[in-house]
Amino acid sequence: MERRSFLKKASVGLAAGAAAGVASTAAVAAPAVQTGLPEIKWRMTSSFPKSIDTLYGSAELLANRLREITGGKFDIRIFPAGEIVPGLQALDAVQQGTVEMCHSCSYYYVGKDKTFAFGTAVPFGMNARQMDAWIIGGGGQELLDEFYGNYNVYSFLGGNTGVQMGGWYRKQINTLEDIKGLKIRIAGIAGEIMSRMGAIPQQIAGSDIYPSLEKGTIDAAEWVAPYDDEKLGFYKVAPHYPTTTRRAGGSRARWCTSM
């Protein structure tokens, strides 16, 4: 199954479960519309640019699905990164009540607490299927609920990216010496590992990566995988794309709402 299809179906199924309280998938063509519901209008800020139709598109599918199965009673308006708040401040926007919901990757916030990484991915950790097993059947969601409760936020699954690549580089990387002093956009604990190898990790939102590479502000960038990376045009300014590095076996995006 294509990753794009899986991510979108995961979002649709999640939406149906959240709103209707029943198991559902994207294959259900005409779900029963719930009646007698209050009108709810939420705003969701995304950490992703609108051009990424897998990540940003999954948020649109969620909103459309909820709108459909509630007869328009539950309406979520989605805003791309930078429109309300910068992409890396999505969680803060929920905490502060600026928006009711966000779609983000929790490892963007390891600067607050490294535990946030376990909601998305850690280097050499679980792949997407193992993450699902842990979160859904292994007590992972309960542990994350307890952790996120400290931030007055509730978080739940929002699709996954699948295996991620090693990043795009302006120069070829052949030895560890080539990594020393390298300014690379990379998120989560992986950035800390790169730092110990001599690189200089940078936290940059997705929509700002291309101009940073083009101007030489950074020397390399890790984002997602070929389909998403091509959308942002990294290959035009950073032609080296090694596949020998496997950092994240299945990064999890997450929906976060205020408690």
For each feature predicted by the language model, list its residue ranges.
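Core domains of carbohydrate- and sulfate-ester-processing enzymes
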Residues: 138-139
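N-terminal secretory/targeting leader peptides
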Residues: 2-131, 143-259
